[in-house]
Curated annotation (Swiss-Prot):
Lineage, top ranks: Bacteria, Bacillati, Bacillota, Bacilli, Bacillales
Physiological role: Shows a 3'-5' exoribonuclease activity.
InterPro entries in alphabetical order: 3'-5'_exoribonuclease_YhaM, HD/PDEase_dom, HD_domain, NA-bd_OB-fold, NA-bd_OB_tRNA, YhaM_exoribonuc/phosphodiest
Full protein name: 3'-5' exoribonuclease YhaM
Pfam family, any one: HD
Biological source species: Bacillus cereus (strain AH187)
GO biological process: rRNA 3'-end processing
Length: 314
């Protein structure tokens, strides 16, 4: 079986089919245009540059295009890149299914649905349970397909649901340690906190921001969705406001995207759980591509650090 892109090491030659995840135009110091493309397959993605591109080439190499690439792997300032020597658009008789080139969550959708449903079933507050079930049912198809982000963490098919399942397990463990926490609020907050991303983001493949995503963002979108759900279900209770606050504050600070800091205990804990799971996902994926005794490539969202994989971690 042919190697996947994440399995190649620095210095190795590459001759492989990949999917263009994103393509961004830039202008080089010599004034000539170039493209920065992110290329992917199920193992992950890699950055490459296409230099001195013409308008015709720009139109060819766009997101969701499958290409045949030849080149070599290099380490440029701590980042792994693919230096392109040859590239062309793949023929239809060579590859046809884009889904063969995208990274997916390591857990089946039906298993994630079963687990999340169990957490909702455990809720004892009827207002919180009804609101959570209503909103998840409304957006379930997209929720199970979408990534949790365009980059940095859980940026793969079904990444949003996978992120939520991991966070629910963390929430349960923390609630068992600190029984004063309201499990219903915390579980609902975990399930709903990023659900607005099914409106903020364009879809599971070559994900970009929608108009609503750019102008409103997933936090504002979800606060409005909770309000609409409460009206439809005729729920006029403080739980609605608290759930809206938990969603509104889950980024922690204004400079991180939350209009209000957490002012409810469960909101504070949700912020930490969200942050922990996102960072663990970034570290695990970077370390998964690294040999024992070596450092990862720089992880931009983690202060551009390179993490060491101990030599005894085989």
């Amino acid at each position: 079986m042919k190697k996947k892109i994440a399995e190649y090491e620095v210095g190795e030659q590459v001759d492989i089919f990949l999917l263009i995840k994103t393509a961004t135009k830039g202008i080089a110091s010599n004034g000539k245009p170039f493209l920065t493309v992110i290329l992917q397959d199920p193992s992950g993605d890699i950055e490459a540059k296409l230099w001195d591109v013409s308008p015709e080439v720009e139109k060819q190499y766009v997101a969701e295009t499958i290409v045949k690439v030849a080149g070599d792997i290099l380490n440029y300032k701590g980042r792994i890149q693919l230096r392109v020597k040859q590239i062309r658009v793949a023929n239809e008789n060579e590859v046809t299914d884009i889904s063969d080139f995208v990274e997916k969550a390591p857990v089946k959708k039906e298993d994630m649905v079963e687990k999340i449903t169990q957490y909702i079933f455990e809720m004892r507050n009827p207002n919180i349970q009804r609101l959570t079930r209503h909103l998840l049912n409304k957006h379930q198809t997209e929720f199970l397909d979408y990534p949790a982000a365009t980059k940095n963490h859980h940026e793969f098919v079904s990444g949003l649901a996978y992120h939520v399942v991991s966070m629910l397990d963390l929430a349960k463990a923390i609630s068992n340690l600190y029984p004063s926490l309201d499990k219903d609020l915390l579980y609902a907050g975990v399930i709903l906190h990023d659900l607005g991303k099914v409106i903020e983001l364009s879809g599971p493949i070559s994900t970009t921001y929608t108009l609503e995503g750019n102008l409103l963002g997933h936090i504002s979108i979800m606060v409005n969705e909770i309000g609409k759900a409460a009206d439809e279900l005729q729920i006029d209770a403080e739980e609605v406001l608290i759930l809206q606050h938990i969603v509104l504050s889950h980024h922690g600070k204004a400079e991180w995207g939350s209009p209000k800091p957490p002012l409810v205990k469960e909101a504070e804990i949700l912020h930490y759980i969200d942050n922990l799971d996102a960072k663990m996902n970034m570290m695990d994926r970077a370390l998964g591509r690294t040999k024992p005794g070596e450092y990862t490539e720089r992880v931009f969202a983690l202060d551009n650090r390179s993490f060491y994989k101990p030599s005894f971690h085989n």
